[in-house]
Amino acid sequence: MSDPELIRALSDLTLAVRGGIPVTIVDPRREASIYYSGRGIITAAGTLVVWAVPAEKRFLLKGFIVTAVVTDTLAAASGEAGILYFLDDADSDRPVCPIGAFDDTAAIGTWFNRDVPDLGSGIRGSALGSNLKIAFYEDIGGGNIEVQWCVWGDEIP
């Protein structure tokens, strides 16, 4: 490429940048057909159903926001920290996505917020009618965790 060609190419590029470069952004929150929100409390070995899927469909999780707060001091039965996570109840409670963790003796008021990780094109349920749940990996011997959530995605065949 000669100097005049290079100068012309740089000039064309400068004009294109000044006018803006067309960019397509895909936001999973705008591509979803299902939005569910709710709240619940996890105690002992409990779970929370966050997305009850019809028998002839699967969930396709595209995004979520979760806030979790210890509302009564925890005492994990194992004495180890525990992970709050989404699970697929049709596949032996297969972990779908981690949400966050609490120490085994987290005090009242301990909290975290998990905001919209990149799930790519989504995480699909393993079977028709599989529900999406939230659980705490360790059994809770005492205390509880209040969880508030919003999940979105699609229900697919």
Spans of model-derived segments:
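Extended low-polarity, hydrophobic cluster-rich segments
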Residues: 10-13, 62, 97
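C-terminal interaction-tip segments
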Residues: 3, 7, 26-56, 71-76, ...
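Beta-sandwich interaction modules
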Residues: 107-129
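Extended extracellular/luminal ectodomain segments enriched in beta-structured repeat modules
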Residues: 55-63
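Solvent-exposed serine/threonine-rich low-complexity stretches and specific carbohydrate-binding patches
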Residues: 37-40, 95-107
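Short, low-complexity N-terminal tether/leader segments at secretion or assembly junctions of large
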Residues: 1-27
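Short, surface-exposed beta-strand/strand-loop-strand elements in extracellular ectodomains
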Residues: 72-97
